[in-house]
Amino acid sequence: MKDFSNFLGLGIAGNFALHLDQAGEAEDFKDIITEDEAAPKGMFPFYLPCKTESASKRPRPILSTYPLSSQKIQLPREQVNVQAEPEVGLVCDIEYKDGLIAKITPTHFGAYNDCSIREAGREKISDKKNWGQNSKGIAQQLLDIDKFTQGGIMDAYAICSFLRRDGKLHAYGEDVELNGYSYFYEKLTDWIINQINTQKDFGPLEDIKSYIKACNY
């Protein structure tokens, strides 16, 4: 697996219909209002490639611990429920202009496990997303993206997931085509650019732009 320790690790909350309800996170986002009812609720950091120093308790220091693994998921030391969250992961190039993100170009994709702590009441969504090394799963080999638009390679792929227990495979969730995301392709990258540039510290969300600046990205 390629080392992504110099990359920013960001996730999207609520880009599938009813996903937040299924993940037990709908209550966390009850006060987040979006212009488009189908739009994702926001973004969260799961890995920051620097050690940030802040007068506040955010971002949490644990976010500077590299969490990705293609071999295993290490459960938290604390006694909490953990759930697998099958997703597609994107590797992207980012261009900046005047201190803001101006362009995002997805270059590779692969299976991704946005493994999360399932526990209500955590202050920020990122509090559930990184508890140390090996807390996120990613494919051993990623695939090249020919074009991040309809008609490209990603049209032919879907997300499916299985859990192995006692030597038996069990289907986990429903098979969903990648273009089944509420926002995808240009609609998604446009939304990400705007969200990172404008998202405030509110409710379960954090000021990601300030984190990026602190990491000199």
For the regions a language model picked out, list residue spans one by one.
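Conserved catalytic-core subdomain
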Residues: 213-217
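A short acidic-Thr-Gly-centered motif at the start of a beta-strand
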Residues: 1-3
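Glycine-enriched loop-and-adjacent helix/strand subsegments that border the catalytic/binding cleft
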Residues: 5-212
